[in-house]
């Protein structure tokens, strides 16, 4: 009886151990089967892919960053060229004429004529179309201080520069004053200098303003003392530019 009881109990223990081993083996097999696809998915997630399924590599980190952000290089635009005609304008520079007269240069230094403007010393500046123009004029003057003594009023000189227009509706022989400037200079004498002229003095008369002009009218400059004009660079000029 005792031997049979032990044998029956040992058989039950052996069957129970076999069952545990079978369960453990099945669990390990399921774990292995689940781990394989998860590992494959993790590896695929780490591999860079583009929309077409191909991997692209860029050697330049900056270019790679631009590609990742979707930047595109735009084509270079050619500079636009303004083909519209410019407004009439002129800038003339004072130049000496024979006989101590005042003439005007149209091409030297900063002088120019544009958009159909024309000039001649005999007839003045001709503007090609009706419109509102800004006219300006600056005439530099210089002189020498006279000897000491005498009446101070006799030493004073009034310098005058004027802009006129002629032609067109005003007729060829009927000039009209447009703008004018004037300045009176009284040189300071040196009491110690009784004979001979003193040092040079310098001044300028300038003005500008808006004038309505018509095609065919001509604008010219008239000055009071052409023998005192200063022809140094930037001292004497006049011009016009259409503003409306």
Curated annotation (Swiss-Prot):
<feature type="topological domain" description="Extracellular">
    <location>
        <begin position="49"/>
        <end position="244"/>
    </location>
</feature>
<keyword id="KW-0812">Transmembrane</keyword>
<keyword id="KW-1133">Transmembrane helix</keyword>
<comment type="similarity">
    <text>Belongs to the tumor necrosis factor family.</text>
</comment>
<dbReference type="GO" id="GO:0010467">
    <property type="term" value="P:gene expression"/>
</dbReference>
<keyword id="KW-0472">Membrane</keyword>
<keyword id="KW-0325">Glycoprotein</keyword>
<dbReference type="GO" id="GO:0043588">
    <property type="term" value="P:skin development"/>
</dbReference>
<dbReference type="GO" id="GO:0005164">
    <property type="term" value="F:tumor necrosis factor receptor binding"/>
</dbReference>
<dbReference type="GO" id="GO:0007166">
    <property type="term" value="P:cell surface receptor signaling pathway"/>
</dbReference>
<dbReference type="InterPro" id="IPR008983">
    <property type="entry name" value="Tumour_necrosis_fac-like_dom"/>
</dbReference>
<dbReference type="GO" id="GO:2001238">
    <property type="term" value="P:positive regulation of extrinsic apoptotic signaling pathway"/>
</dbReference>
<dbReference type="InterPro" id="IPR021184">
    <property type="entry name" value="TNF_CS"/>
</dbReference>
<feature type="transmembrane region" description="Helical; Signal-anchor for type II membrane protein">
    <location>
        <begin position="19"/>
        <end position="48"/>
    </location>
</feature>
<dbReference type="GO" id="GO:0005615">
    <property type="term" value="C:extracellular space"/>
</dbReference>
<dbReference type="GO" id="GO:0005125">
    <property type="term" value="F:cytokine activity"/>
</dbReference>
<dbReference type="GO" id="GO:0043123">
    <property type="term" value="P:positive regulation of canonical NF-kappaB signal transduction"/>
</dbReference>
<dbReference type="GO" id="GO:0032735">
    <property type="term" value="P:positive regulation of interleukin-12 production"/>
</dbReference>
<feature type="topological domain" description="Cytoplasmic">
    <location>
        <begin position="1"/>
        <end position="18"/>
    </location>
</feature>
<keyword id="KW-0202">Cytokine</keyword>
<protein>
    <recommendedName>
        <fullName>Lymphotoxin-beta</fullName>
    </recommendedName>
</protein>
<dbReference type="InterPro" id="IPR002961">
    <property type="entry name" value="TNF_C"/>
</dbReference>
<dbReference type="Pfam" id="PF00229">
    <property type="entry name" value="TNF"/>
</dbReference>
<feature type="domain" description="THD">
    <location>
        <begin position="88"/>
        <end position="243"/>
    </location>
</feature>
<comment type="subunit">
    <text>Heterotrimer of either two LTB and one LTA subunits or (less prevalent) two LTA and one LTB subunits.</text>
</comment>
<dbReference type="GO" id="GO:0048535">
    <property type="term" value="P:lymph node development"/>
</dbReference>
<dbReference type="InterPro" id="IPR006053">
    <property type="entry name" value="TNF"/>
</dbReference>
<keyword id="KW-0735">Signal-anchor</keyword>
<dbReference type="GO" id="GO:0006955">
    <property type="term" value="P:immune response"/>
</dbReference>
<feature type="glycosylation site" description="N-linked (GlcNAc...) asparagine">
    <location>
        <position position="222"/>
    </location>
</feature>
<dbReference type="InterPro" id="IPR006052">
    <property type="entry name" value="TNF_dom"/>
</dbReference>
<comment type="function">
    <text>Cytokine that binds to LTBR/TNFRSF3. May play a specific role in immune response regulation. Provides the membrane anchor for the attachment of the heterotrimeric complex to the cell surface.</text>
</comment>
<dbReference type="GO" id="GO:0016020">
    <property type="term" value="C:membrane"/>
</dbReference>
